[in-house]
């Protein structure tokens, strides 16, 4: 038998990219239906036929007032909820009605975000080699990844990965996975999509389950998409952020702090009061592990993209690390304008940051800083930590068309 002309090591080297994974484009989308937070308590208690619960309504108003949210977007309209009263009860069988919405609307909203990202990227969609789709809403086979592949007209040979039921940390997870795919497959261009619709979690109030009402006060609908690839061709591609490292960890003593259960009644959501404390108590360890190798100990010298699980989490992280208010400006802006969109949030924040950096005349896509951190927090408690490196802003760059 003739000897092989190449070695495994040579094959492996040829398969891998040279440089780090890079975010090449970002797109976002929301449903048309906009809900203003100031009006939401009256609307919520009216549509769920709970107006007789006056004390509970006052508590909910206070939750909304403290949420630091100005508006959110929701696919569920008053008309649809009126036609599906079981979705307005606290615990009524309603999974079929919820699933019928999300299995259609999740890929559709994802498509809107993906089309914007592909347009900004400016390359033929035939160059997309991988698709990573993430949602906490709606489960079917074939999944939302398949539906989106068909909707966008991607190649049948695109390598798909579907991630269901990850929760709020997953905006970091998809970047970690996309980084590995891009760096280990030379020439790969990974389309990443996070699409979240709260139709699975919407339900009426309960006096015995105030944690469920916290979710009703915070969550909104949205989809975000990014194109990730290594070794960008800068004649036709414009890098936005480099993905330098990525890791995931489960926080100690946090079991049951956030969990969800998909049942006949939809997706129920539960959280303990000490979630902000658990996250802030452990945030410094994650920062040290990520940035000590880089010689960075001043966390005001980096840009921040933190999942806005709620204002208390942001306030306690800010206090624990001694952050200046400006560091979480992009994060708080997205919370204010969209609410908590689960996995999609951090990608919205990346989009806001690169746009605002360009508009403000900053030197880099990361508010003028070179290094940055992206945090995802969610069920587990699970924390995703992604180290980012910004790129210099050239005239007209970093703002989508």
From Swiss-Prot:
UniProt-listed Gene3D superfamilies? 3.40.47.10
Is Transferase tagged as a keyword? Answer: yes
Metabolic or biological pathway: Secondary metabolite biosynthesis; flavonoid biosynthesis
InterPro entries the UniProt entry points to: Chalcone/stilbene_synt_C (IPR012328), Chalcone/stilbene_synt_N (IPR001099), Chalcone/stilbene_synthase_AS (IPR018088), Polyketide_synthase_type-III (IPR011141), Thiolase-like (IPR016039)
User: From which organism does this entry originate?
Assistant: Sorghum bicolor
Signal sequence range:
none
- This protein's encoding gene: CHS3
**Which family does the similarity line name?**
Belongs to the thiolase-like superfamily. Chalcone/stilbene synthases family.
Name this polypeptide is given: Chalcone synthase 3
Tell me which EC number(s) this protein carries: 2.3.1.74
**Which BP terms in the Gene Ontology apply to this protein?**
flavonoid biosynthetic process
Outline what the protein does: The primary product of this enzyme is 4,2',4',6'-tetrahydroxychalcone (also termed naringenin-chalcone or chalcone) which can under specific conditions spontaneously isomerize into naringenin.
Q: Which residues form a coiled coil?
A: none
Pfam families named among the record's database cross-references: Chal_sti_synt_C, Chal_sti_synt_N
What catalytic activity is recorded?
Answer: (E)-4-coumaroyl-CoA + 3 malonyl-CoA + 3 H(+) = 2',4,4',6'-tetrahydroxychalcone + 3 CO2 + 4 CoA
Active site residues according to the UniProt entry: 168
């Amino acid at each position: 038998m003739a000897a092989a002309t190449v070695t495994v090591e040579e094959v492996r080297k040829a398969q891998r990219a040279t440089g780090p994974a890079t975010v090449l484009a970002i797109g976002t989308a929301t449903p048309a239906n906009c809900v203003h937070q100031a009006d939401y308590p009256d609307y919520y208690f009216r549509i769920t036929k709970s107006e007789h619960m006056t004390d509970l309504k006052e508590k909910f108003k206070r939750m909304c007032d403290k949420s630091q949210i100005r508006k959110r977007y929701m696919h569920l309209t008053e008309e649809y909820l009126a036609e599906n009263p079981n979705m307005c009860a606290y615990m009524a069988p309603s999974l079929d009605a919820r699933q019928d919405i999300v299995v259609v609307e999740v890929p559709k909203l994802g498509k809107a975000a993906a089309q914007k990202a592909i347009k900004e990227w400016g390359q033929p969609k035939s160059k997309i080699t991988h698709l990573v789709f993430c949602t906490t809403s709606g489960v079917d086979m074939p999944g939302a990844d398949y539906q989106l592949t068909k909707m966008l007209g991607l190649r049948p040979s695109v390598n798909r990965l579907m991630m269901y039921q990850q929760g709020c940390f997953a905006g970091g997870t998809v970047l970690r996975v996309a980084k590995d795919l891009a760096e280990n497959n030379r020439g790969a261009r990974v389309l990443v999509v996070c699409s979240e619709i709260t139709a699975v979690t919407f339900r009426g109030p309960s006096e015995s389950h105030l944690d469920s009402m916290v979710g009703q006060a915070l969550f909104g609908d949205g989809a975000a998409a990014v194109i990730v690839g290594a070794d960008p061709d800068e004649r036709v591609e414009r890098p936005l952020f480099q993905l330098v490292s990525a890791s995931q960890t489960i926080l100690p003593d946090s079991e049951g702090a956030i969990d969800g259960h998909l049942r006949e009644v939809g997706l129920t959501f539960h959280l303990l009061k000490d979630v902000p404390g658990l996250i802030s108590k452990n945030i410094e360890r994650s920062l040290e592990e990520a940035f000590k190798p880089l010689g960075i100990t001043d966390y005001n010298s980096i840009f921040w993209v933190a999942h806005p699980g709620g204002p208390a989490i942001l306030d306690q992280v800010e206090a624990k690390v001694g952050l200046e208010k400006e560091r979480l400006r992009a994060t708080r802006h997205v919370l204010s304008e969209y609410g908590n969109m689960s996995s999609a949030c951090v990608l919205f924040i990346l989009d806001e940051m690169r746009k605002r950096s360009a508009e403000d005349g900053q030197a880099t896509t990361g508010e003028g800083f070179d290094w940055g951190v992206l945090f995802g927090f969610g069920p587990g408690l699970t924390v995703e930590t992604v180290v980012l490196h910004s790129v210099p802003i050239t005239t007209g760059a970093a703002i989508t068309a």
